[in-house]
Amino acid sequence: MKIVLATEQDIAPVKDRYLVLELDTFRIKDNIVPSWCVIDAGDIPLSEMTELDHFKTQHENLIKNYKKGDLNFVEQMLEHLRGKFGGNIDSFYMELFARLQQPKSDPWDYIITKEA
């Protein structure tokens, strides 16, 4: 698995050859840039391949609800997604779970600010 920072437009060609899942979104200077994990199909167990589209949809819903601030949904979905995708993104799921244990910012901001 690789993690890359790229716009949706820039990552689109990679989606034809690899499984690409959105992770966090970063603010670097004045630019908002999402991060993506790129997983080779060979890194995913054959037993998961039949449900891969389902897991991908669940992950997309997790990210969508995280952005909206529906952290209860996120916490429940994390339980279902751990171990999926060959365990390749479990460290991301553990990081999200750790964030959920912290007080929620008001107003909610899912974007992580980084210095360039």
Residue ranges of model-derived segments:
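Cytosolic regulatory/linker segments at or just downstream of nucleotide-handling modules
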Residues: 1-64, 68-73, 80-81, 85-99, ...
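Alpha-helical linker/edge segments of TPR/alpha-solenoid repeat scaffolds
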Residues: 99-116
